[in-house]
Amino acid sequence: EVGLLIPSRLLRETSRAATRAENQNSGRLRAPVNRAKTYNLAMIDLSSLFGQIDIYLFDQLLRGRIGPGMTVLDAGCGHGRNLVFFLRQAYQISAVDPDPDAVRAVRSLAGRLAPQLPLSNFRAEAVESSSFPDHAADVVISSAVLHFARDESHFQAMLRGTWRLVKPNGLFFCRLASSIGMESRFTSLGGRRFALPDGTERFLVDEPYLLELTSGLGGALADPLKTTVVQDRRCMTTWVLRKVA
């Protein structure tokens, strides 16, 4: 059973995982270490601890912004890829997703990793109209959700339905598709809907729009905007806000 970890111990835990794997691989006869197998075992151990957590959300953990005892709500949780670590570490977790099958999967995950949490914490609802109360969590996650908005009105409803869940001084972590860095590579479908080179259609934001939204929400950037350009396919921007009290 994995014990509680504070953010400052996360890097040490990853190192220990590699050490444990190497010790398992060394054997009684101290045979030569198979490095590929060692690190494969380490990655299995890390995957068990962290799941498939978004690397930029992991960065927030390492920087101490999401600490033990905080309430965390995943708005658009999918099958729970970002929740494994938080469930293992006894955070107070809630989640919402419009897909009932996804919510059933998250309830099953929580039942194994955090059976003390009530199933009512995990709800099959649209993020724009969830039944969670205002100021429900210290940290609200919106990872790869908002770019599925049908149009501007839907985007605004999803965003504001998510933002209202953040407590005063709380953290809003969002990753969403954008046009930043590939402005000329997208085909407009009207409004902010675009066809992407990877064959998908998305609602895309840009830097001026995100800054305008930040001001309109009454938030403050916790980090500068960060955008990852996936070679000639799409762009994903990390938008992290603090809710000003």
Where are these regions (language model features)?
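A short SAM/SAH-binding and catalytic strip from SAM-dependent methyltransferases
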Residues: V139-S153
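A short glycine-rich, Lys/Arg-flanked "PGG" loop and its adjoining helix->strand segment in the class I
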Residues: Q156-P168
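Short linear motifs in low-complexity or flexible loops
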Residues: G3, T14-A21
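A short acidic, Gly/Pro-enriched loop at the edge of an enzyme's catalytic core
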Residues: E128-V140
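Class I (Rossmann-like) S-adenosyl-L-methionine-dependent methyltransferase catalytic domain
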Residues: R35-G67, L73, G78-S129, L171-A245
